[in-house]
């Protein structure tokens, strides 16, 4: 199998893009292991489940993050959780790639202003898949916590 991917997308922040998440995850699963495939599940619970249950989710998700080779985030629908996951991944030197539909939203300056993140704006879903191929097909991922793969359509290249 290829890379271990942590896919991040809005859950409690809104499920308007859940079908898109499902398609992206299915595409990546052809040659990779998506640790968070449940994010594409249309039937995920959107309600808080209590501190104990949420603590279990936190522990599982952060373990998956630390195990992952790369984080792929779809950020068209704003999400506090996805923002937290991105910051956590940066802290652990996990390469992060952020996709968003620029016809529907703008990213926070906290993301676009941080050169750690590879930003991939798109207008049509079909634009996502060649970029994923480039990201996931690259040989090297980490050098001092930085992405070494070629970046496409980035807002903040290093």
Q: For the regions a protein language model found, what residue spans apply to each?
A:
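Conserved catalytic or regulatory cores that recognize and/or transform ribose-phosphate-containing ligands
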Residues: 1-158
